[in-house]
Amino acid sequence: MIDLTPNPEQMRDSARRCAEEGIVVPTFAQMKDPSLVPQSVRDELREIGLWDVHPRNLFRITWKNEPIPRGGGFGGVNYVELPSSLTGVDARIIALVGKWFPTGAHKVGATFGCIAPRLVTGQFNPVTQKAVWPSTGNYCRGGAYVAALLGCESIAILPEGMSRERFEWLERVAGEVIATPGCESNVKEIFDKCWELRATREDIVIFNQFEEFGNH
């Protein structure tokens, strides 16, 4: 289960940061059913691009975004059905499409599910702590993006062999990017770096996707 033990002092810091940055944190119910999103937020989204680093894009962490790059509202689930001529089986196979999430990857939802409970309970302090996102790919990308929307600083950790585009994007969004030895298969090296950070820094919270209930 997710630990919801409150830390009132740090909750006040979170509330103050949200007020300063104009951040409105959506509920999980609103993400599941965007018809619950207030009209005022929908109006703002008409002027915001899907990938913009803007706090209202927190409301676009849903499978039900209108499939356009800017100004979109909400609709049905984005999916494609794979034809039998391609799959070779009679069963209907439907694939969900992550392209129309902010960042073009559905892991923004997983990372929000990890950091949001810590923020609202005060277990993570956006004023004094940094969120660490160890990953070989989209979890790291999603975490840095969601943290930026929530007014939090991030440390992204990923293998040096990942694409140059990924590093360049993270350098614009995350406060710090750490490259570890190897490529996508070198997961151990990522978590070796996490242990090193735990031993040398006091202002971090590591969001390990393999142990975070919010990722599942």
Walk through the language-model features, giving the residues of each.
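PLP-dependent amino-acid enzyme catalytic core
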Residues: M1-H216
